[in-house]
Amino acid sequence: MGTTTSCDDFLEVDQYEILPSDYMFKTEANVITGLNGIYDTFYTDQETKLGDDQVWGFKPHVFAANHPTMDCQASGWDAEWQRHAWKPDKESLESAWRMSYRAIDRANRFLEGLATADPSIFADSKSQAIYEAEARAIRAYNYLYLTKLYGRVPMLVPGETYSSTPSKPRPETLDENYATIEQDFVYARDVLDWEPLNGQYGRVTKGFCKAYLAELYMKKKDYNSAKAELKSIIDDGPYKLEPCYGNLHNEDTHWTKESIFEIMYHKQDYMGWGANSSSDAMIWFGFMCAAPEWGGWGSMCLSWELVRSFEPGDKRRQYSIVAKGDTNPFTGQTVGVTPSFDGLFQGSENMPTVYSLKYWRCKPGDNNQVYNPISLTLKRLAGVMLDYAECCFETGDAATGWEMIRQIRNRAWGNLEPGATVAYFPKDWLNTETVEVPDAQTYYAQYKAKKGYTSDLWKVAVIMERRYELNAEFSLYHDLCRMGMCDEWFKAEYPKTAANSTPDECLKTGDSFRYFEHQAYQELFPIPTNEILSNSAIGPEDQNPGY
């Protein structure tokens, strides 16, 4: 939102022991404050010091969606992600469970109280329904995220909180989860507008609801319903492709015309050490994502396989990746010029000397800037267009599917750039005239044959365009799992050969050493250990298979 009010303390249980239980619902101003407290759960929690709560939104979201594909890699305890070695006690998975249910808990408390509010306190007759819609949409978003990670999860409803209902079983089927999520999104979709309430960007909107409702339908393989929601976003929504791909992740530049929903991290007066003591709107992308050669921690490297797979002319490579020999256009630092960092890999764990320009946009700690004002853009139009393409192919409309891919690739080759401006990249990176873009069907037919994919041509095209368009964002591994493509992905993109049979061999070739064979059970993550220990209705026998 333009100004997001933090209500962490206001919504904690102990506050209900001090204030009357209906205090939040006596005035409309109090209702809005309570609603803002639910929005606060999109942000990090800088007080708990638990798991990855301090980088919530980035971890585990980006890690669970990318590192298991091996396109993104990390050292230290985060190496478990790309090695498929995660366990039920992994802190990131604990954070995902805890933080998602924190949002659900707040939404349930709010919805229970809102239903008792006197309608006369609202200045507009529609306001109460709008506040309900926003709360239900956020609850549905969190439930949907939990199902992507864990499958069946306990469903707390208004009247049930983590305190009042510490023990609740998983439902028998995913359909029970999906039914509640669908009801919430449909209600919110029909109440909310395309534009955010009061022009406060950061609030959920009709576009948010439609995009995530479509995601739910795609999980259910109801492609016709998903297609209708996605088509509406493209045809009726206010969104357009940003002309320059490089403008999508600029520092302190929020809500491009392409953005459907993002979590804004603004530039603040003080962003040095200790700034997080007064604000949860702090996150340190720079330290996590910069090259270790230049002060990074090694949490976000990209693979040489990803780098080598880009087609000549695809500008998404230069706008989103900086590799050995490249110079970061924001910091002026060249990768691989320092002894011990000058190979294809660096460090004792052999991390690729390849990094994401989406998040490494400053010198970490330089001028006492510890935290970074870059939005987490959870949904944008390009992703919706690729989802729509998939649904078109699944419903027999191949021509429209290929047209969506054509439009995405047209922007990727810079053909929307003539006449555009770029905020931070060198201006001479912009195209001044249009160029010819290779035909996607022709190219991917050759790529499919070369790599040995067995899926339909359109599936290869869609997943590869997601790879390039949404690298290091929020969906790739989840899409591979949903589409049933994981096994062939690893065989095609990260094959085990004589040339990469050991880590030492990989040092010579730039290949990533794959520590695992794909197992279908790992397309879900394990229920966190703490939940099994504390929830008497979920025992070890209820753990996801394989863990």
Regions found by a protein language model. Name each.
Residues 7, 59, 64, 72, ...:
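Long, intrinsically disordered, low-complexity segments
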Residues 8-77, 178, 186-187, 203-347, ...:
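An aromatic- and glycine-enriched ligand-binding surface/loop that stacks and positions planar moieties
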Residues 32-36, 40-50, 71-150, 172-176, ...:
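Conserved, well-structured interaction surfaces
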